[in-house]
Amino acid sequence: MVAIVAVSEHWGIGKDGDLLFSIHQDMRRFRTLTSYMTVIMGRKTLESLPGGKPLPKRRNIVLSSRMEPTEGVEIAHSIEELLALVADDPAEEIYVIGGGQVYTALLPHCEKVLLTKVYASPEADAFFPDLDADPAWKVASESELLEEDGLKFQFIDYVRA
């Protein structure tokens, strides 16, 4: 599995159910990488998508203990059930796309994290684990410093150390 996430300087990812940032280059990268792949998310992340609908051109799996059946979505009620669902997945990559609790629960099952680091510190109430403080992770590659609408950011790929 691969986690894909945009974080603030303090590893914040969201506030009040919304993303902290809307960066076109980041969204384009997300679409390019995840299209025709499997994406795993929590119930609140699904509800935050446009119309609360699953992402098109992807296999959408929601990890939730209390989600009702929804068209276009497979539901896993536990990590064990999720792992069984994706065991024979033909997708080249399986992406974990949030939110905070799902990232924390599935990070031990990820071999890579594709991170957009935004050099800003808006208030957040959902966070991604600090990979720089975790010796199990190391930076594999990073882009040059980019800027869009006054926000400076980098694409940083982490792999297990």
Q: Where do the PLM segments sit?
A:
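Enzymes that bind and transform nitrogen-containing heteroaromatic metabolites
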Residues: 1-161
